[in-house]
Amino acid sequence: MLVRPLEPGDYPAVAAVFAEGIATGQATFETAVPSWEEWDAAHLRTHRFVAELDGEVAGWCAVVPYSRREVYRGVGEESVYVAESAQRRGVGRALLEAVIESARAGGLWTLQAGIFPDNGASLELHRSLGFREVGVRERIGRLNGAWRDVVLLELRL
């Protein structure tokens, strides 16, 4: 497995993995994959990675700023997505470890993750890398007409 910085040319594969996550209904409130321009503008350029298996993008991890307020400049929210065909092969762990290292080296002091309670694999992965649950945001948003809760986890760097 190769984990490397995400490049613009990776986006079609990143978008395909993202689309798989959207289709599960357990990964995100998003209902459509954003354009490269939208995705690029939202994510911090120094904290985005892809993992390759056999030369193909098998997953990605990236960080968005938690807030535009200066007081929170060192807090990021990370997302990690793994292709269905690559799950349970260490891809998510390798990606999340890369983002944690990058965030720490880049001066961030906290990473957050918001995960649906039913996404046991993601909760397990995050907890295994030191993220701790700080609460449940009840009925925080609607997905396909239904209110959803989100488990909020964070890691102090």
Language model features with spans:
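Conserved beta-strand-loop-alpha-helix junction that forms the acyl-donor binding cleft
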Residues: 87, 113-123
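Conserved GNAT-fold acetyl-CoA-binding loop/helix
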Residues: 11, 15-41
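Acetyl-CoA-dependent GNAT
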Residues: 31-85, 96-97, 102, 156-157
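Conserved acetyl-CoA-binding loop-helix of GNAT-fold acetyltransferases
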Residues: 88-101, 123-128
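Conserved GNAT acetyl-CoA-binding A-motif
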Residues: 103-115
